[in-house]
Amino acid sequence: MRFTGIILILISMTLIDSFFEMKVEATGPQTTCQAAMCEAGCKGLGKSMESCQGDTCKCKA
């Protein structure tokens, strides 16, 4: 029964993660997104980079 509970928790975490997009925003005086920093931040979250525009870095869900 515990194993089934763990599986249900993992599945629900995966589904919730797929509905909410993660955003990584660099702090500091920079006003433009740097692709290398954005990609490194997304990799730190275990995701790949989706886009880097303006001052917003988006990671793929």
Curated annotation (Swiss-Prot):
Cysteines joined through disulfide linkages: 33-52, 38-57, 42-59
Similarity section: Belongs to the short scorpion toxin superfamily. Potassium channel inhibitor family. Alpha-KTx 18 subfamily.
Signal peptide start-end: 1-24
Domain notes: Has the structural arrangement of an alpha-helix connected to a beta-sheet by disulfide bonds (CSalpha/beta).
Task performed by this protein: Reversible blocker of both Kv1.3/KCNA3 potassium channels (high affinity) and Shaker B (mammalian Kv1.1 analog) potassium channels (very low affinity).
Compartment(s) of residence: Secreted
Keyword hit for Signal: yes
BP GO annotations: envenomation resulting in negative regulation of voltage-gated potassium channel activity in another organism
Sites marked Penetrates into Kv pores (more deeply into Kv1.3 than into Kv1.1): 60
Single GO MF annotation: toxin activity
Tissue specificity as recorded in UniProt: Expressed by the venom gland.
Name the record gives this protein: Potassium channel toxin alpha-KTx 18.1
Keywords, in A-Z order: Disulfide bond, Ion channel impairing toxin, Neurotoxin, Potassium channel impairing toxin, Secreted, Signal, Toxin, Voltage-gated potassium channel impairing toxin
Main subcellular location of this protein, as a coarse class: secreted
GO cellular component: extracellular region
